[in-house]
Amino acid sequence: KNISAMHMVSDHFTDANKDIFILKRQTDASNNTQQLSLDGNSPLATNTPPLAADSVAFASATIFGQEASNNTYVYAAKFDLVITTTAGGIPTVASDRKIIVRNNPPGQETWNVVPAAIQISAAPYLTFQVSSVTSSSTVKWIGNLELTVVT
């Protein structure tokens, strides 16, 4: 089946759930900083992993970027995050651990990934900002995000 997210809820309590998301985006010389989404487009309420107001969330992610025409040039990072969200829906990355698994962009280019706890229409969401400081590379980014939200 073709899905980009999976939602799990416990039989024993209703204030927590776990979701698994596949995220995508592309960067190039003209658009060198982007945010990942479920459909590879700009983050909207319908295509971005949601958080919840007045909650804590635990996230684990692997984000991978590869030059579109040469699989030698890659960037890979793993993240463990704790995100807190106020009753008003303002999310904050309270704790993060980033492990760069591979950092091999071409020449003098710089590629990077950072977590982004954002609001869309006053609701909290989690995504990742990907960047490639480049004059010529097109980088395809993909991410695997596991997100547990407790309200």
Describe these PLM feature segments.
Residues 1-17:
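Structural motif
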Residues 13-56, 64-75, 86-96, 103-138, ...:
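Surface-exposed ligand/attachment interfaces on beta-rich extracellular proteins
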Residues 77-81:
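Compact beta-sheet-dominated globular domain cores
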Residues 137-145:
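Edge beta-strands of jelly-roll/beta-sandwich modules across compartments, strongly enriched
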Residues 145-151:
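Short beta-strand-to-coil "C-cap" segments at the C-terminal boundary of structured domains/repeats
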